[in-house]
């Protein structure tokens, strides 16, 4: 990996071998920055800041990350260039037009102290966790979520207008419902598969019969996640509230997840060790 003007790195090359890598160094020398660069190549975002310009070295106008991988018997090249105008992504020297086509090329999983906030923070943090992981696994999910967010922004803007276009509101609601069915089903499946993998590992670590689980809270019951008409009825039922508030109050942008240990909410009953 090569880092140019990324955080405190002016122009640095780093090589990794197979197996476990242990990164050692004094404080403020760039250990976390190195991991941040790897994670940026996976998700095209930082886990520490929402502003890409914060990643650019002081007094510079851009940064570059070059990553060379060897997998599946062949060499692969990834490049990320970020400047004040935005991101430029490349695979094997070819420009990538859509971020969704780049995310997941490097499938990295990050665990850091801030992850403890997953249980105590707002539902937005839990949705973000699911969205990031699913985006690395499914381009369809990434594209559908992006389209939904665009439609949601348009619907909210429409709700704030004095003269409401009823036909356009209906069209937006229908298009959003189509997206939401895909999003809800993929979120539900992801959580089911995640916990199926986690349960035996958790029991092994805890060395007891503690049962971990989750409840996915969304706008439809788990048995009706593909019921488009039911979702549209909810939009219609919430129409007056949406008009009064000037925003859409029903949808997957309000989803949440409750994590449990032996049926009890992790946030209220789990120890710090259990949360980790």
Placement of each model-derived feature along the sequence:
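Conserved NTPase motor "head" modules and their coupling/switch loops across ABC/AAA+ ATPases, GTPases
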Residues: 1-26, 167-276
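Conserved RecA-like P-loop NTPase ATPase core
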Residues: 5, 34, 55, 65, ...
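Phosphate-binding glycine-rich loops of NTP-binding sites
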Residues: 17-54, 271-276
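Conserved, well-folded catalytic cores of nucleic-acid-processing
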Residues: 41, 132, 136, 151-154, ...
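Nucleotide-state sensing region of NTPase/ATPase domains
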Residues: 42-125, 131-141, 195-199, 227, ...
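Intracellular alpha-helical coupling/juxtamembrane segments of multi-pass membrane proteins
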Residues: 55-58, 148, 187
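A general alpha-helix detector
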Residues: 129-132, 154, 175-182
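Extended, charged coiled-coil "arm/hinge" scaffolds of SMC/Rad50-like chromosome-maintenance ATPases
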Residues: 142-176, 209-211
């Amino acid at each position: 990996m090569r880092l140019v003007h990324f955080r405190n790195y002016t122009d640095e090359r780093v090589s990794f071998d197979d197996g476990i890598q242990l990164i050692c160094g004094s404080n403020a020398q760039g250990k976390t920055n190195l991991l941040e660069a790897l994670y940026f190549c996976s998700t095209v975002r930082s886990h520490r800041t929402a502003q890409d310009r914060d990643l650019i070295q002081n007094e510079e106008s851009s940064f570059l990350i070059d990553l060379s991988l060897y997998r599946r018997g062949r060499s692969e090249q990834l490049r990320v260039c970020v400047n004040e105008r935005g991101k430029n992504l490349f695979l094997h020297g070819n420009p990538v037009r859509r971020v969704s086509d780049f995310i997941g090329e490097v499938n990295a999983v990050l665990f850091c102290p801030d992850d403890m906030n997953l249980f105590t923070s707002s539902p937005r943090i839990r949705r973000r966790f699911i969205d990031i992981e699913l985006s690395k696994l499914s381009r369809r999910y990434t594209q559908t979520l992006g389209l939904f967010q665009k439609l949601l922004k348009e619907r909210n803007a429409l709700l704030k207008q004095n003269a409401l276009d009823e036909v356009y509101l209906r069209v937006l609601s229908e298009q959003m419902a189509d997206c939401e069915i895909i999003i809800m089903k993929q979120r539900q499946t992801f959580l089911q598969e995640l916990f199926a993998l986690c349960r035996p590992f958790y029991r092994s670590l805890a060395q007891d019969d503690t049962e971990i689980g989750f409840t996915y809270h969304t706008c439809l019951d788990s048995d009706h996640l593909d019921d488009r008409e039911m979702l549209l009825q909810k939009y219609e039922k919430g129409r007056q509230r949406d008009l009064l508030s000037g925003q859409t109050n029903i949808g997957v942008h309000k989803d949440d997840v409750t994590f449990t240990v032996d049926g009890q909410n992790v946030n209220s009953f789990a120890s710090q060790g259990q949360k980790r």
